């Protein structure tokens, strides 16, 4: 039964009701379908026009332009009633604009993504309704809500009510599938995390526009300078003379050295490829991965640096300011579930903001007397590998605060590492200063001095440490000899030897990764660590008939997904705990960003120091489900601007 709350003249297709009746009815239910219709997609510029809520028996369709929906808060914010939505972040932001927070939700879109992680599938409501319920939703009616300003038609009211029915039917099917795959905890995590991401998208992050414009101007100037360096390189090479301009226009206001005399558009991959082929570099494209192996060549190195600078100038130049909303804040949009369980952001991509603080510091709290309190995990993926492999060296190094990369380098390189130590090497030096000197018990329980094994500045050690560090972090991405060779600019044979020596020193890590790879090859899927056990499917898996190429892809993904995915599960758990703590205690704190394993909040400065320690405790507590030893710690800082 449809009950309409709005203009009483529209009664031919349904009963007329009130918000009070809707609240009374919905309060008595344990599960409800919820949907909204809006005039557009951007909550900052558009408005909510319809709220639909109900169960399989009664659906209330409320014209939010005509009535006050604030009484619905007690239903929508109740933690005792499950609210089913599709793409909850979208509806949540419009509801928050109306002063209502959501709690205890089930997102049918996220459920589909969880169940089909790794597979190519559409997660739209229309496709799910068609696939599971065998009902075709009307596209014609769906599009009529955009920009709609008049009274609702009967077809629009019926369409809105049907959405509620479909959501309830879909969720009933999804619950069974989630239970069969033992992903109930994961689904709860994703549903709760969606509200935290919704808060971030709603809150936005402030931007210091004048400082950003200064950076943009500097970046563009440097791009032009690098463009001229590329031109000058061509001008000195007779073999590339075909790319010289036959004539060029001078300008009395521009220095001759600043006038381009080379007929190459460096932003055109096609033209650049022609230049490289003429130069003698035989490649099929000019992508960074392709060119990296040739980086020792001065010309290629210069071009790669130019591309990096050009990206700063274009992606993070004046064009970026188009992302600033009317309130001076930047709002991104999160894609919550990638194949590994990690997130991505777009419009703009905040995860790709240059890590250096020149750019990060342009982002501000944007509220008087508010500051940033940010927290990130220290060596999160390394701690996950140590926990999964139970490697004694890794566990000891991380537990005792030693520099893991240096410890690994010592074991991999042996005598070469020892012979490369300088006289004042911080890895070996004895000292009575705190954090430099350390003690341990011998077999008789007596304190003995031991090397602090901290990162040092010895030139040779730096190189050896970098080599091993590349492997340590590369483990999380399934790095092989080819990639390692490209990264370190060494031969593939040298990379193979380095990896062999590495696994000889750390057999437990080799076994851990091998077993992950075998599991994926044998089952066609891989899981993250307990308790969430996120499942990633491999559609290309065909048992014994899987091609060698696909076997390689599956093996690599099986090694990195549990590491990256468990890290993602941990970060989402932290976000949920932070959000719950803020709301439960009504704190003057807002979550404004999350990038990789970092959570960024803004807080009134009078509460900043207190919140710093609270946030650090929450970040630590959120790791214990996955790393019960408490091995992983968080670094938390207070700052005036956003920092790495």
Language model regions located:
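Short acidic, Gly/Ser-rich segments with clustered Asp/Glu that frequently serve as metal-coordination loops
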Residues: 31-44, 377-384
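A short acidic-Thr-Gly-centered motif at the start of a beta-strand
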Residues: 16-30, 74-77, 355-371, 583-584
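Short amphipathic alpha-helices in soluble, non-transmembrane regions
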Residues: 611-619
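Conserved "right-hand" nucleotidyltransferase catalytic core of DNA-directed polymerases
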Residues: 1-14, 36-37, 164, 168-358, ...
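Short hydrophobic beta-strand that contains or immediately precedes a catalytic carboxylate
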Residues: 32-34, 85, 105-106, 372-376
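Conserved catalytic core of nucleic-acid polymerases
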Residues: 202, 330, 335, 416-418, ...
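Active-site-proximal helix-loop-helix substrate-binding element of RNase H-like nuclease domains
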Residues: 2-13, 42-179, 187-191, 197, ...
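Short, contiguous acidic/charged loop-to-helix segments that flank catalytic cores in large enzymes
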Residues: 291, 316, 320-325, 338, ...
């Amino acid at each position: 039964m449809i009950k309409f709350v709005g203009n009483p003249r529209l009664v031919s297709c349904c009963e007329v009701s009130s918000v009070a009746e809707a609240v009374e009815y919905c309060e008595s239910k344990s599960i409800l379908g919820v949907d909204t219709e809006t005039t557009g997609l951007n909550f900052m510029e558009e408005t909510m026009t319809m709220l639909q809520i109900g169960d399989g028996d009664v659906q209330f369709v409320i014209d939010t332009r005509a009535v006050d929906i604030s009484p619905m808060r007690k239903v929508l914010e109740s933690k005792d009633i499950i609210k089913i939505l599709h793409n909850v972040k979208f509806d949540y932001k419009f509801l928050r604009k109306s002063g209502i927070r959501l709690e205890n939700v089930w997102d049918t879109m996220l459920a589909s993504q969880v169940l089909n992680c790794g597979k190519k599938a559409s997660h739209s409501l229309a496709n799910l309704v068609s696939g599971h319920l065998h009902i075709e939703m009307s596209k014609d009616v769906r599009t009529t809500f955009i920009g709609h300003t008049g009274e609702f038609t009967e077809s629009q009211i019926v369409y809105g009510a049907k959405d509620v029915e479909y959501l309830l039917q879909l969720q009933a099917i999804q619950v069974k599938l989630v239970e069969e795959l033992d992903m109930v905890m994961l689904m709860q995590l994703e549903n709760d995390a969606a509200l935290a991401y919704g808060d971030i998208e709603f809150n936005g992050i402030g931007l210091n526009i004048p400082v950003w414009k200064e950076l943009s101007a500097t970046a563009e100037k440097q791009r032009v300078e690098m463009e001229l360096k590329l031109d000058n390189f061509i001008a000195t090479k007779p073999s590339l003379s075909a790319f010289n301009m036959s004539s060029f226009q001078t300008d009395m206001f521009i220095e001759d050295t600043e006038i381009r005399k080379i007929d190459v558009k460096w932003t055109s991959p096609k033209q650049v490829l022609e230049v490289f082929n003429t130069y003698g570099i035989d490649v099929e494209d000019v992508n960074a991965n392709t060119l990296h192996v040739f980086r020792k060549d001065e010309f290629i190195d210069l071009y790669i640096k130019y591309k990096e600078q050009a990206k700063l100038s274009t992606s993070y130049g004046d064009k970026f300011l188009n992302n600033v909303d009317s309130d001076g804040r930047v709002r991104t949009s999160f894609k919550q579930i990638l194949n590994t369980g990690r997130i991505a952001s777009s419009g703009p991509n905040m995860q790709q903001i240059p890590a250096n603080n020149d750019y990060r510091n342009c982002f501000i709290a944007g509220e008087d007397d508010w500051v940033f309190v940010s927290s990130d995990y220290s060596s999160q993926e390394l701690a996950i590998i140590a926990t999964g492999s139970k490697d004694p060296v890794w566990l000891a190094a991380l537990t005792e605060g030693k520099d893991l990369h240096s410890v690994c380098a010592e074991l991999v390189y042996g005598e070469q590492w020892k012979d490369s130590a300088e006289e004042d090497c911080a890895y070996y030096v004895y000292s009575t200063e705190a954090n430099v000197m350390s003690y341990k018990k011998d077999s008789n329980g007596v304190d003995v001095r031991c090397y602090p094994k901290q990162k040092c500045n010895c030139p040779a050690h730096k190189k050896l440490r970098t080599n091993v560090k590349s492997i340590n972090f590369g483990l999380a991405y399934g790095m092989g000899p080819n990639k390692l060779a490209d990264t370190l600019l060494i031969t593939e044979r040298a990379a193979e030897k380095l990896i062999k020596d590495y696994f000889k020193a750390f057999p437990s890590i080799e076994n851990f990764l091998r077993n992950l790879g075998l599991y994926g090859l044998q089952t066609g899927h891989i899981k993250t660590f307990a308790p969430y056990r996120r499942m990633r499917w491999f559609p290309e898996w065909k048992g014994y008939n899987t091609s060698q190429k696909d076997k390689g892809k599956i093996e690599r993904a099986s090694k990195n997904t549990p590491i990256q995915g468990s890290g993602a599960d941990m970060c989402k758990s932290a976000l949920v705990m932070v959000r719950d703590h803020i709301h439960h205690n009504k704190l003057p704190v807002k979550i404004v960003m999350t990038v990789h394993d970092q959570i960024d909040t803004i807080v009134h400065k009078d509460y900043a120091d207190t919140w710093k320690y609270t946030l650090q405790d929450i970040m630590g507590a959120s790791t214990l489900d996955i790393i019960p030893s408490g091995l992983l710690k968080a670094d938390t800082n207070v700052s005036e601007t956003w920092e790495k």
